[in-house]
């Protein structure tokens, strides 16, 4: 069992030290939600100890809220209803797992908020049913687990050794390690030996989309990624020819930065 990322000081508040890295600057919480409906907030479980008994109900409530927020792809919604998000975060934060919030997973990284996961996956899957998908930035493994519910071949690359090990343990616990090929490496380079991919999902923001990733899209394939530094937007790119791509800008977001190389 992983150590809790925070500890309560008696007031019910987790310590700043325990939540190191969990700040708006490295959260992928959306900057603006003004255009989205505002459903009733989800009431979290009383404690992580009894969350297992309530997780099915909480996941269904989360999925219903995502539907109210405009996610309509049943493949994505069914997949998110099937994956226990609370098992991908520290026990100290498990009671918040089904809130629409990014949560810290260590190494100054976060698990993406459910709306962002659903939005990004739905966008790249809208035009086709992808059979081979690349995820750049495995993190704790949650998004890869969601993809594995309906995608035949999922490849997920993580540059931080500690997160790679965390994702591997989480996927193994759910018996998904044979359905997700997890790679420790530089995500900006993709996985050229496995390309082309029907879809690529990038879970970190760069100033520009790496050309290596664009080159690894199959014809008609789609890539989605946050782009920018202090001001970021989701960008959806579709490959339309051998050397041509179509680009569309979507919502404002905030993600951790995309970095090259690996971190041991």
UniProtKB/Swiss-Prot annotation:
GO-annotated biological processes: methylation; protein modification process; protein repair
E.C. no: 2.1.1.77
GO CC terms of this entry: cytoplasm
Molecular functions (GO terms): protein-L-isoaspartate (D-aspartate) O-methyltransferase activity
EC primary class: transferase
Reactions catalysed according to its record: [protein]-L-isoaspartate + S-adenosyl-L-methionine = [protein]-L-isoaspartate alpha-methyl ester + S-adenosyl-L-homocysteine
Bias (Polar residues) ranges: 24-35
Localization in the cell: Cytoplasm
Active site: 112
Function, in words: Catalyzes the methyl esterification of L-isoaspartyl residues in peptides and proteins that result from spontaneous decomposition of normal L-aspartyl and L-asparaginyl residues. It plays a role in the repair and/or degradation of damaged proteins.
Name of the protein: Protein-L-isoaspartate O-methyltransferase
Organism: Bordetella avium (strain 197N)
């Amino acid at each position: 069992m992983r150590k809790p990322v925070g500890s309560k000081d008696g007031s019910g508040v987790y310590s700043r030290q325990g939540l190191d890295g969990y700040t708006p600057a490295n959260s992928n919480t959306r900057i603006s939600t003004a255009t989205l409906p505002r459903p009733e907030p989800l009431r979290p479980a009383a404690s992580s100890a009894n969350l297992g008994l309530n997780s099915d109900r909480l996941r269904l409530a989360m999925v219903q809220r995502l539907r109210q927020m405009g996610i309509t792809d049943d493949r994505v919604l069914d997949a998110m209803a099937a994956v226990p998000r609370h098992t991908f975060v520290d026990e100290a934060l498990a009671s918040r797992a089904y809130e629409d919030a990014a949560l810290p997973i260590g190494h100054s990284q976060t698990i993406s908020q459910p709306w962002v996961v659903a939005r990004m996956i739905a966008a790249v899957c809208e035009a086709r049913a992808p059979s081979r998908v690349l995820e750049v930035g495995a993190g704790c493994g949650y998004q890869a687990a969601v993809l594995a519910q309906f995608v035949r071949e999922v490849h997920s690359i993580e540059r931080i050794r500690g997160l790679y090990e965390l994702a591997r343990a989480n996927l193994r616990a759910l018996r998904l390690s044979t359905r997700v090929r997890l790679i420790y490496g530089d995500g900006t380079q993709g996985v050229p030996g496995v390309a082309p991919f029907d879809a690529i999902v990038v879970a970190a923001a760069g100033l520009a989309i790496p050309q290596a990733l664009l080159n690894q899209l199959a014809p008609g394939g789609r890539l989605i990624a946050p782009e920018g530094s202090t001001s970021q937007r989701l960008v959806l790119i579709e490959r339309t020819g051998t050397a041509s791509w179509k680009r569309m800008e979507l919502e404002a977001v905030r993600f951790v930065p995309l970095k090259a190389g690996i971190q041991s």
